Structures are given as C-alpha cells and as structure tokens.
Amino acid sequence: MVTTQKILMRGGKSPLARVTYDETLRNNLLGTNSGNLIFADSVFRTLYSKNTTIDVAGYSAKPNTKEQAEKINAEYDMLILPFANAFRKDFIPLLDRFTKLINQVKIPVVVTGIGAQAAINSDLSELDFMKDSVTEFCKAVLQRSASIGV
C-alpha cells in the first residue's frame, strides 16, 4: 500500500496554480525577486508526484505561533523550506521566527539552498552579527533533518 505524503512548503504559489502577472506582483508571489519563485517551483516540481500533496504556504507568513506549529504537526508529514540568501541582515528577524517554529514542530524539516549574501568586496566579519541566529536555526533544522542543502 502506497501512502501519500502531505507536505507544507514555503513559496509564493504552486506552479500548478494559474495567476496573472498583476496578481503575481500585487500578492508578492515572487518573494521580492523572480529567483525565489523559480527556485521554489523547481523544489515543488521535484517533490510532486501521485504520492504527494504539497501545500504552498506563501512568503508573508509570520512563522512563530504555537497554534501554527500545532496545525502543521496535525496536518503535515514534512515541512520544506526552500531558501536562497536567507543569511542576510534584513532576513534575520524572519529567520529567527522560523527557528521558533521549527523548534515547535515534530515533523521532518528540509531546508534547501540556504546561504549567505554579502557584497563581493565586503569584510566577512561584517556578518558576525548574525552568527547566533544562523547557529540556532541550523541546530533546529538538524534536530529534524539529516542535513541542510546549501
């Protein structure tokens, strides 16, 4: 007997959903740049099969409530987080909220494509301010997954 996996994935929209250009911009389905949409779509398409159901959660969620974690635990088998340049100054508050959420879920968490963003000539010591946030995020994920995709 084949069982169906129910997956919750961070992303702007399902690649199966038909939306207009105006809806895409108005609802920020790009996640502020088209690379986010392309990356999330590729993860979705890789996982999509007759044995998976994938719900796309959007980008604007505030992931840190106990109720949200309880709902995820009750309804899903896996949480997929396609990230690109999440280790950057303006994303750290959201990364910290994801850490809180991940610490509350009991299902496997898969992170793909995460990395740091900095200017080509920047002093990497300028990234030290986020070390604690990045470390806590990675610890939370690795308690629920064997690895983190970079």
Model region roles, listed by residue range:
Residues 150:
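Mid-sequence, gly/pro-rich, charge-dense loop/helix-turn segments that line enzyme active sites
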Residues 1-147:
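Aromatic- and Gly/Pro-rich donor/ligand-binding loops
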